[in-house]
């Protein structure tokens, strides 16, 4: 059998038609992988959970929260608040907040065009809090840096961010460096050129290795998950 291990499924944002006469890229790549002959896929933090349904083969969907949550707990932040940079990520952020037993804050944003955030409002209280923004990936860093700056203006004591995939394209490194973020934490699902001193990466190698061992031995991988 052939098992494909793809920590960052790069086509995951193309999970639906956003305008006429365009392909659904995630479904196309899923079909190409199946035709190429893979029997199973191991990946992490897909942009949308329903992408698992694009495949006609078993998909093992791992979660970066397995390594992020112990790291957050080790910080021992007194007034921790978990935040989502947009309403779409509220389910993910809510699961973090529930596990860590802390409040949840949401950001409501409107986009002027792709990768450009026009306005943003905070739903919840961040004054005097240590905020950690949770997202699945950071591309141009426009949303996450704007959220951090607005939360600082609203009285947050500190603002950090964690995201599974370090896309960090274009002006992202410069934006993070100039923002109010104290730390930007990623996994190493995508290599980073260390252009920004605020960026730190945690390895997911052990998590994937454990998943591969369990799959090969026909064991359950669900007890790896924390949330």
Regions found by a protein language model. Give the residues of each.
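PRPP-associated nucleotide enzymes
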Residues: 1-227
